[in-house]
Amino acid sequence: MESVERKSESSYLGMRNMQPEQRLSLDPPRLRSTPQDELHDLLCVGFGPASLAIAIALHDALDPRLNKSASNIHAQPKICFLERQKQFAWHSGMLVPGSKMQISFIKDLATLRDPRSSFTFLNYLHQKGRLIHFTNLSTFLPARLEFEDYMRWCAQQFSDVVAYGEEVVEVIPGKSDPSSSVVDFFTVRSRNVETGEISARRTRKVVIAIGGTAKMPSGLPQDPRIIHSSKYCTTLPALLKDKSKPYNIAVLGSGQSAAEIFHDLQKRYPNSRTTLIMRDSAMRPSDDSPFVNEIFNPERVDKFYSQSAAERQRSLLADKATNYSVVRLELIEEIYNDMYLQRVKNPDETQWQHRILPERKITRVEHHGPQSRMRIHLKSSKPESEGAANDVKETLEVDALMVATGYNRNAHERLLSKVQHLRPTGQDQWKPHRDYRVEMDPSKVSSEAGIWLQGCNERTHGLSDSLLSVLAVRGGEMVQSIFGEQLERAAVQGHQLRAML
């Protein structure tokens, strides 16, 4: 027994002493680049986590170790991803120091679909030489910085099929036979973000997965000092360069991002005055209790989709506390403790260095050039019917205003404006099926062509649609929906071959 233990220990030490670059790397990419002028099988607009999950699922479907029939797939899918950013990045503007993920690392881009995949978070740790060290953290919640690095590591495996720095501007229907009335491909036009050059690629199938765009309250002026939370870590340091200066900084919002920024500003600019402005009466904790968390289980999408529109809306409202305008309890407690210590020193809140102004809304912002501070006008967010006593009016003079008011998820409407006429008669908006393929008039569009939407289907697929929780499983569903017939043919061929042996 002792010799076995020593042998095991020796083997472990040998692996532990290997440098990360000596460890086994992933297999050669199973997705290969396609010449731009060729007709693609699939073109994905955007290469964030949603598209990355599709790439991983397709890679795994072509891996004979995971899919016995993969060796019968003779033609590699012709696929390309177009991404506006110059490299893979996930919420780079909100990689706040010390911030952690809000979901388990098991909900990575592969594990829930197939834990044997090479693209699991645990394999990432193994390849980086940190697996044993991570276990010592005793947590399921990695640092947000590390999880972004995990996704970047995954993305690097697909560099051959991603065109970075390409912003898609429109999708145009096309016909191989000009005399035909049926669309059988799409032309995706993109602009190079550096040169402005326009490129065009033809594809049978299109996935739109461009994520959200910054939502800014109406009435806020265009000013470089008014910054959306998505650009906090990338833009504010360049604007307020001297960390020792006594800046005045305001944050608008009551959700996780607003709370993280408000908390981080106090460390980043220790001599500054910070103010958190919110419509709500208080920060509210997110509900991540086990039973409630089951709404993010991948199989719950089926149940949600099968409901009527009215039932879906009721479900969204009932589950709002899991995701919208809520903050993790641990952070709320930290912020409250900081506020309390100020109260110990001075009971007059107006004199505090860091303040929270609940039940307020911004009515207007005066800005008279970069040399003078912006003036923010506030009033009560309560309905006027509740009395004039609540009509508090205040002004703040600030060097910067961080706006953490969420995201819009309707950018696909603009990209697909030239395809709208292909919707069924009387349909005034895109209607995704359960497999995320949008409904089109079959008399106008070939069954070989299609468009899929990702991350903008909350009203039909539930709260998890724009979140990481379902991406591993959904990536597999997308591959099945797009390439299912090809994969099934390969499976049949495999069964026939084995039957002959």
Swiss-Prot record:
Keywords: FAD, Flavoprotein, Monooxygenase, NADP, Nucleotide-binding, Oxidoreductase. One of its GO terms (biological process) is siderophore biosynthetic process. This is L-ornithine N(5)-monooxygenase. NADP(+) binds at S254, G255, Q256, S257, R279, N323, Y324, S325. Disulfide bonds: none annotated. It comes from Aspergillus fumigatus (strain ATCC MYA-4609 / CBS 101355 / FGSC A1100 / Af293). It catalyses: L-ornithine + NADPH + O2 = N(5)-hydroxy-L-ornithine + NADP(+) + H2O; L-ornithine + NADH + O2 = N(5)-hydroxy-L-ornithine + NAD(+) + H2O. Pathway: Siderophore biosynthesis; ferrichrome biosynthesis. Homotetramer. L-ornithine N(5)-monooxygenase; part of the siderophore biosynthetic pathway. Aspergillus fumigatus produces four types of siderophores, low-molecular-mass iron chelators, including excreted fusarinine C (FsC) and triacetylfusarinine C (TAFC) for iron uptake; and intacellular ferricrocin (FC) for hyphal and hydroxyferricrocin (HFC) for conidial iron distribution and storage. TAFC consists of three N(2)-acetyl-N(5)-anhydromevalonyl-N(5)-hydroxyornithine residues cyclically linked by ester bonds; FC is a cyclic hexapeptide with the structure Gly-Ser-Gly-(N(5)-acetyl-N(5)-hydroxyornithine)x3. Its EC number is 1.14.13.196. The keyword Ribosomal protein does not apply. Substrate binds at K107, N293, E294, I295, F296, N323, S469. Disruption phenotype: Moderately reduced growth rate during iron starvation and in iron replete conditions. Only displays 1% of wild-type conidiospore production in iron-depleted and replete conditions. Completely attenuates virulence in a mouse model of invasive pulmonary aspergillosis. InterPro entries: FAD/NAD-bd_sf, Lys/Orn_oxygenase. Residues 381-390 have a biased composition (Basic and acidic residues). Belongs to the lysine N(6)-hydroxylase/L-ornithine N(5)-oxygenase family.
